[in-house]
Amino acid sequence: MPNRLPMPPAEPLLNAPEFTVSELSQSLKRTVEDAFGHVRVRGEISGFRGAHSSGHCYFALKDESAKIEAVIWKGVHGRMRFKPQEGLEVIATGKLTTYPGSSKYQIVIEALEPAGIGALMALMEERKKKLAAEGLFDEARKQLLPWLPEVIGVVTSPTGAVIRDILHRLEDRFPRHVLVWPVKVQGEGSAEQVAAAIRGFNALPEGGKIPRPDVLIVARGGGSLEDLWSFNEEIVVRAAAESMIPLISAVGHETDITLIDFVADKRAPTPTAAAEMAVPVRSDLFVEVADLARRTRAYWQRAHESRRSELRAAARALPAAGDLLAIPRQRLDSAGAALPRGLKANTHAHFRRFTAAGAKLTLRVLHGQIAQADHRLTVCGERLGLSARSLLRQRRDRFAGLEVRLRASKLSNAQAQRNAIARQRERTHRLAERANRALVTLLQRLDARVEASGKLLSALSYRGVLARGFALVRDEAGHPLHSADSVGPGARVEIEFADGRVGATTDADRPAPPAKRAQQPKPAAQETKPAPKRVGKPVDQGSLF
């Protein structure tokens, strides 16, 4: 028979403490919580199917050889910046405890973060595919930026260097009205604030108290992928996609890529570049407008000269009214002059034939034929006269109409030339008025400068000192005297006051001043300086009067 271990005595088992199932579960719960407290656990999320109807989240954390149940309460889940995703490797921070209902230990997660850059990149790629499948990144959805916006809305932190860079760049290029919606750009709640700012700008009414922006800039400085993660959240991406205002994303540096860059209407590598995309350079616009104005003036000048040359050529090509009527008038005069001669010649010819025929006829027949011929001749003469007068009247009416049309054409051309001359005269008058106004402005400025110079000259003149009660003493040559030693006894001097000059002679009994050393000639600028103020009166100085 196989060897068996001896059974322990029954008496010690009877002394072991007795627990109910609930008591044992609670004891194990206290032991686990006291022994471990808060822990950080690294593992892969498994079994996550989204939040429960109660708002709590239940899943498991596992690695290659073990698994632990995890729970996130509703309030904690709502405050989390990083939400759990199935299959994502994370680092969970929470409190280790047990669930008495099934005697299983679990971790109550209070904070969740991805385990390294790889996990974040995988999550970002998954979101990118999901949003792209919804068509949020399609180029057809994107709007064109306004050429020169009146109001620019900026969503960024109000205390960072980003807003200063944007404002400075806008000031350099083309100052515009800027509205800043201050938000947190990283950390808990930052994604919600950015999305709310984008939707808030879009909710502003047209013509309201706060102007509605024409373009939006969502900006943030550079940082790590974790720092920029708020701009990868779906709430921010969807808010940017729903924006009816054209949006420029300027998150991070040129090498930083976030999901908002794919849905924005334009992506700028830096916040400064976003400001450059929003507005053109004002000086370039001034140059372009000036060039267009110059080209327009040159075009109209060329067109005006061309039309004037064509008008002059057409006027030279037109014949004079008298020349048009000269030849028809000459023909009419020739026809009128030849008509009586033709009538006479025709009458003589018929008369000769009549005479020849009359010799062959009897007197009675001859008289009858003569009477008939005379009647026919009279009728023909009347008809010929009527026809000639009618033809002459028609020709005159025709030539009168031609003359009226030619005069009207000439008057119309002359009126057009007078109108052009009047326009040029009016333009010259306007230019002269502008030149006169500029000349008046220049003269006013020069008068102001002359007046200011006169005031400065009066302030610096020695006459201002005389007006305060001082006097200027000169010798007979008119040179100012700077000391009492320079005046000999009995010398003639001239004293200038503010209101005039008087002559004076120094005391004769005053001792002569000592001989002065030869001094270097002073510059002319120093001769006009007033004598230095003396304290008291020298004992040897006599009265000047």
UniProtKB/Swiss-Prot annotation:
Reactions this protein catalyses: Exonucleolytic cleavage in either 5'- to 3'- or 3'- to 5'-direction to yield nucleoside 5'-phosphates
CDD domains: ExoVII_LU_OBF
Biased composition (Low complexity): 515-525
Keyword Cell inner membrane: no
An example molecular function term from Gene Ontology annotations: exodeoxyribonuclease VII activity
Classification via InterPro entries: Exonuc_VII_L (IPR003753), Exonuc_VII_lsu_C (IPR020579), OB-fold_nuc-bd_dom (IPR025824)
Keyword entries, A-Z: Cytoplasm, Exonuclease, Hydrolase, Nuclease
Pfam families for the chain: Exonuc_VII_L, tRNA_anti_2
UniProt family annotation: Belongs to the XseA family.
Complexes and interactors: Heterooligomer composed of large and small subunits.
Stated role: Bidirectionally degrades single-stranded DNA into large acid-insoluble oligonucleotides, which are then degraded further into small acid-soluble oligonucleotides.
PANTHER family assigned to the protein according to its UniProt record, in alphabetical order: EXODEOXYRIBONUCLEASE 7 LARGE SUBUNIT
Listed name of the protein: Exodeoxyribonuclease 7 large subunit
The encoding gene: xseA
